[in-house]
Regions:
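Thiamine diphosphate
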Residues: 1-161, 166-167, 175-177
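Conserved beta-strand elements of the Class I
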Residues: 25, 193-195
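Conserved active-site beta-strand-loop modules that form the wall/rim of enzyme catalytic pockets
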Residues: 156-157, 190-193, 206
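Short beta-strand-to-loop junctions in surface cap/lid or active-site-entrance loops
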Residues: 184-189
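Conserved small/polar residues in nucleotide/adenosyl-binding loops
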Residues: 197-204
Length: 208
């Protein structure tokens, strides 16, 4: 079964779409490697912005680009994107209703040995508390691809949390039912209802 990190899936679909859509922009805060965005930066240098370790600038620049008609995807570790640049995410992106997609990479404790400074237990709750900000946690590469394609057309503030490690496929390329802001039924039953998302999807599904 195919296993790649969802962050890699994001890069792949953005690279595919950026060939035709020159308004797609990727911004990183010294995190292109961690975000798996190095191939995008190498192949589309005019559509890539490196802000350095400056998360507030990352988000504000993204909002400004969106106001100019661009489609920015701002990538940074979830632990910093949801704390250091929280005011900018709230005011410049969500309250201003700008077309910015924030991508929090290596969410939860997936940074492992880097320790508590890089862990993010708060990002989902923090971003969900901001009016106008939608929060997404795709389960595998196929769902991630559909989500990015939908967000390119949707043009509303969004936050995506992805993990660091490869995840097994839940869906297939030909069978990935996807509807924006709607849950997907994976298995039918009568005894119990189980709701799950993100990286726990494959693990939970194996028990049902």
């Amino acid at each position: 079964m195919n296993k790649i990190p969802n962050r890699q899936a994001i890069c792949e679909v953005l690279m595919d779409k950026a060939k035709e859509d020159k308004d797609i922009m990727v911004l990183c805060s010294d995190s292109r490697g961690s975000a798996s965005m190095t191939p995008f930066a190498d192949n589309f240098p005019d559509q890539f912005v490196e802000t350095g370790i400056a998360e507030q600038n990352l988000v504000s620049i993204s909002a400004g680009l969106a106001k100019c008609g661009k489609k920015p995807f701002a990538c940074s570790p979830a632990c910093f994107l949801s704390t250091r640049s929280y005011e900018q995410a709230k005011v410049d992106v969500a309250y201003s209703n700008t077309n910015v997609t924030l991508i929090g990479i290596s969410g939860g404790i997936s940074y492992g040995a880097l320790g508590m400074s890089h862990h993010s237990a708060q990002d989902i709750a923090a971003m969900s508390a901001i009016p106008n900000m939608r929060v997404y946690l795709p389960s595998d590469r196929h769902q991630t691809k559909h989500l990015i394609e939908a967000l390119l057309k949707d043009e509303k503030p969004s936050y995506i949390r992805v993990g660091r490690n490869p995840v097994e496929d839940i869906y297939t390329e030909d069978n990935c039912p996807f509807e924006m802001d709607k849950a997907t039924v994976l298995k039918e039953g009568t005894d119990v209802a189980v709701s799950y998302t993100h990286l726990r999807a494959h693990e939970t599904d194996s028990y049902l």
